[in-house]
Regions:
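Bacterial Sec-dependent N-terminal signal peptides
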Residues: 1-23
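Glycine/tyrosine- and acidic-biased, solvent-exposed loop/turn segments at the edges of beta-strands
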Residues: 16-152
Length: 152
């Protein structure tokens, strides 16, 4: 077998192995391991057919670890965040449709906590703030114009 054919064969093996290793149920019928949800799994999502809506891992039927949600093109990330016991927990990033960051923040017990930065779709900072343990803005809050200059 020539090296090009061998390379194609090995690539196909990895592709099929990856696809077969996702969207599995455990012995109790709960979602387990890596899952990729497509439009058929979210019929009300208004996405075109056969595109990814979101993907991540399940443990005991609950979202755990890093999850990615996609914009309607099925490729551009919309949100990347950590889940713990089926709830957003920890650092996450939301993205504009042009792939630039929209927001960076941390969620603890379904509330903002710590630093939060929001961005315009041109990549310039729109807002910088801090959230206390109750999920309320605290301390110095800053707003910026779309050109990046501080609002007085």
């Amino acid at each position: 077998m020539n090296s090009k054919a061998l390379l194609v064969f090995i690539s196909l093996c990895f592709f099929f192995n990856e696809n077969c290793a996702q969207n599995k149920l455990d012995g109790s019928g709960r979602k387990s391991g890596k899952w990729v949800f497509q439009v058929k799994d979210h019929p009300s999502s208004n996405y075109a057919e056969n595109l990814k809506v979101e993907e991540g891992n399940f443990i005991n039927g609950r979202k755990e670890g890093i999850w990615l949600r996609y914009h309607k093109d099925g490729k551009t990330p919309k949100l990347k965040g950590n889940y713990r016991n089926n709830r957003p927990e920890g650092f996450y990033i939301r993205y504009h449709r042009n792939s630039k960051k929209m927001e960076e923040a941390t969620f603890i017990q379904n509330k903002y906590k710590g630093n939060c930065i929001r961005y315009y779709n041109n990549g310039k900072v729109a807002y910088k703030g801090n959230y206390n343990n109750s999920g309320e803005e605290s301390g110095k809050i800053q707003y910026f114009h779309k050109n990046g200059k501080f609002c007085l």
